[in-house]
UniProtKB/Swiss-Prot annotation:
Name of this chain's protein: Eukaryotic translation initiation factor isoform 4E
Modification after translation: According to the redox status, the Cys-97-Cys-138 disulfide bridge may have a role in regulating protein function by affecting its ability to bind capped mRNA.
Entry's family note: Belongs to the eukaryotic initiation factor 4E family.
Keyword RNA-binding among record annotations: yes
Protein role: Recognizes and binds the 7-methylguanosine-containing mRNA cap during an early step in the initiation of protein synthesis and facilitates ribosome binding by inducing the unwinding of the mRNAs secondary structures. Mediates susceptibility to Turnipmosaic potyvirus (TuMV) and Tobacco etch potyvirus (TEV).
Entry-linked PROSITE patterns: IF4E
GO CC annotation terms, alphabetical: cytoplasm; nucleus; plastid
Gene, per the UniProt record: EIF(ISO)4E
């Protein structure tokens, strides 16, 4: 059985009609907000320049924002980018953060590349809900500090007292970062004193 159109080329993928599912944005489990802070003014109160930049809840919005705006290599000196759950401010005083702390990874080698990679891997892990203890995580902060030559990422938690949860978060984050460096946990109410190291 032969047909007349056997040798006709198939339509290119761009010519095929998209299904309804392909047209729909890919929703995330929860909404997230990017924040920006530039602490370059001496004597300014902490948080005086902190601004919410954008809230999103789809994979497509995340990639558009990350690719055009929110990359650590685009930060100026003493600036910070934050990604926090929508409704949570990246401040110790926020009720979601007040009884928590933060895991911190200090980046000293290949700083720009390492910080960019660690930032992106952490963002994808957060919005992709890769942490078993995702409800205990508030967000992440990327800080650029050229004077001290120590850029850093800090993963903020809701708890400071549940050691099992904190160690689970710390170990998973270190696995996500794929680093041998130590990461340290500090309470928000006493961020000068290290509590855990993995």
């Amino acid at each position: 059985m032969a047909t007349d159109d056997v040798n006709e080329p198939l339509p290119a993928a761009a010519e095929l009609p998209a299904t309804e599912a392909e047209k729909q944005p890919h929703k995330l489990e929860r909404k997230w907000s990017f924040w920006f802070d530039n602490q370059s003014k001496k004597g300014a109160a902490w948080g005086a320049s902190l601004r919410k930049a954008y809230t999103f809840d789809t994979v497509e919005d995340f990639w558009g924002l990350h690719e055009t705006i929110f990359q650590t290599s685009k930060l100026t000196a003493n600036a910070e980018i934050h990604l926090f759950k929508a409704g949570v401010e990246p401040k110790w005083e926020d009720p979601e953060c007040a009884n928590g702390g933060k895991w911190t990874w200090v980046v000293t080698a290949n700083r720009k590349e390492a910080l960019d990679k660690g930032w992106l891997e952490t963002l994808m892990a957060l919005i992709g809900e890769q942490f078993d203890e995702a409800d205990e995580i508030c967000g992440v902060v990327a800080s650029v500090r050229p004077q001290s030559k120590q850029d850093k990422l800090s993963l903020w938690t809701r708890t400071k007292s549940n050691e099992a949860v904190l160690m689970g978060i710390g170990k998973k984050w270190k696995e996500i970062l794929d680093v041998t460096d130590k990461i340290t946990f500090n309470n928000h109410d006493d961020s000068r004193r290290s509590r855990f190291t993995v």
